[in-house]
Design a protein with these regions (language model features):
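Long, His/Glu/Asp-enriched segments that create or flank divalent metal/ion-associated functional microenvironments
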Residues: 1-267
Length: 267
């Protein structure tokens, strides 16, 4: 479908920037308090060629803004946006950029280590998955193609959990890939069956989770906690509940363990 196609890396970079800027304009002062320095994000094509999108935080004084990078595999010049809009929300706004940028900004609340160095996967990646779901709830993914991209991402993340736990805890592989002990080839077949990502991206994902035990489940555990926190905060506050106030209070905690986050937000 040409509606979801981009041609060339310049068009890809511009599309990323436009999506990020429009969300900042829509979200600031409505669903989020976004400090002025955090309202700038720079979207770039990464020098690496591994596939995927990632985020790097701003400098302490925001002279270098937060940046969202797309690592384009060598030779790839055509891009489908239907799968990637949800990833832009994950890595950019209201995902990692808002989360990390606000933490860096809160120097009156957090020490330098908490602002610039601390990262807990369940907290950070859980927030980014929560951000994806929030954007769907707010109507930003009502287009069927873009919503299909959200579901495709959820399928991959669920498959990664199965792979991570199965490989690192010694469980048998599913019957669909032959059962028995997990092997690289069985893991590859399993990922291919449960995601529409390109080969370069899936190879990157497979190598990542073979060598990083526990990271894949942390995404989903963290997402579940963020959703539970919001629901519980809303139940306690009733009609006085403010989504913007909830987000500000939760993000002001900075990165930390999930128990710490729960206690700080609900106590």
């Amino acid at each position: 479908d040409p509606r979801y196609q981009l041609h060339g890396t310049d068009a890809l970079r511009d599309w990323m920037q436009e999506r990020a800027d429009e969300v900042i304009a829509a979200m600031a002062d409505t669903h989020f308090d976004i400090p002025e320095p955090v309202r700038t994000i720079e979207c770039l094509i990464a020098p690496t060629q591994t596939g995927g999108i990632y985020y790097t935080g701003p400098s302490d004084d925001f002279s270098r803004p937060g940046r969202m990078w797309w690592s384009v595999p060598k030779g790839v010049t055509e891009f489908g946006t239907w799968r990637e809009l949800t990833t832009v929300y994950h890595e950019g706004v209201p995902g990692h950029h808002l989360q990390v940028g606000q933490t860096v900004y809160r120097r009156e609340l957090l020490n330098k280590w908490r602002r610039m160095m601390c990262w807990t996967s369940g907290h950070g990646e859980g927030w980014a998955l929560y951000a994806e779901r929030l954007m769907a709830e707010l109507g930003f993914m009502d287009d069927p193609g873009n919503y299909l991209g959200l579901l495709d991402g959820q399928s991959l993340r669920a498959a990664r959990v199965v792979l991570d736990i199965g490989v690192h805890c010694g469980f048998e592989a599913p019957a669909e890939v032959g059962g028995g002990s997990w092997t690289y080839d069985k893991a590859w077949t399993f990922l291919r069956a449960h995601s529409n990502e390109g080969e370069e991206m899936l190879r990157f994902e497979l190598n990542r989770y073979l060598g990083w035990p526990g990271q894949a489940p942390s995404y989903k555990v963290g997402e579940r906690l963020w959703l539970q926190l919001r629901d519980e905060a809303q139940q306690r506050a009733g009609d006085a509940f403010s989504l913007k106030d909830f987000h500000r209070r939760a993000l002001d905690v900075g990165s930390g363990g999930l128990d710490v986050l729960r206690d700080a937000v609900l106590d």
